[in-house]
């Protein structure tokens, strides 16, 4: 799925029409960090070293988060949404809903360890829609870049 992730939807700061607010208390928040803080954690030191090497002011990066946000080729984060089955076989009111929930919890809890260059900052399990599913939002990055900052945002090379 391609598109913008909705952090406000994931954290239930607003409710879409397919959400049952009476079940929202069953949702699980695994991780909720400010994306700007994550960018500072990941990129500030590399940005400082990069800027120190620049002889032209127009090559300096003032705010890496804003640079990525204003890029036509990048977006500040990526999101995956995972569910097991569909509303008929693992839906909220089926026998397998709890099994699906436990599998998704295990998957979400281990995602960061399995994907060390996808920095998870926002992750939620939703039990208030038709089927249990988990949203995982992350910032993909690489280290050791030779072309720009030593630590930089990239979706394609983060999976190598």
Predicted segments with their positions:
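Conserved N-terminal glycine/acidic-rich loop preference
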Residues: 131-138
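Short glycine/proline-enriched loop/turn "hinge" motifs that connect secondary-structure elements
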Residues: 68-77
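A short, contiguous, amphipathic alpha-helix enriched in charged residues
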Residues: 55, 91-119
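A short beta-turn/loop motif at secondary-structure boundaries
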Residues: 124-131
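Active-site-flanking beta-strand signature of metal-NTP-handling nucleotidyl enzymes
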Residues: 77-87
């Amino acid at each position: 799925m391609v598109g913008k992730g909705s952090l406000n939807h994931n954290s239930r700061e607003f409710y879409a029409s397919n959400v049952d607010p009476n079940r929202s208390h069953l949702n699980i928040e695994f991780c909720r960090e400010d994306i700007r803080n994550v960018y500072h954690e990941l990129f500030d030191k590399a940005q400082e070293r990069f800027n120190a090497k620049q002889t032209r002011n127009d090559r300096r990066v003032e705010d890496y988060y804003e640079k990525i946000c204003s890029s036509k080729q990048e977006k500040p984060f990526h999101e995956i949404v995972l569910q097991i089955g569909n509303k008929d076989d693992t839906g909220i009111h089926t026998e397998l809903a709890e099994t699906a929930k436990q599998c998704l919890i295990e998957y979400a809890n281990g995602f960061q360890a399995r994907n060390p260059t996808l920095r998870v900052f926002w992750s939620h399990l939703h039990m208030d829609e038709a089927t249990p599913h988990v949203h995982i939002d992350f910032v993909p990055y690489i280290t050791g870049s030779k072309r720009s900052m030593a630590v930089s945002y990239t979706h394609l090379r983060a999976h190598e």
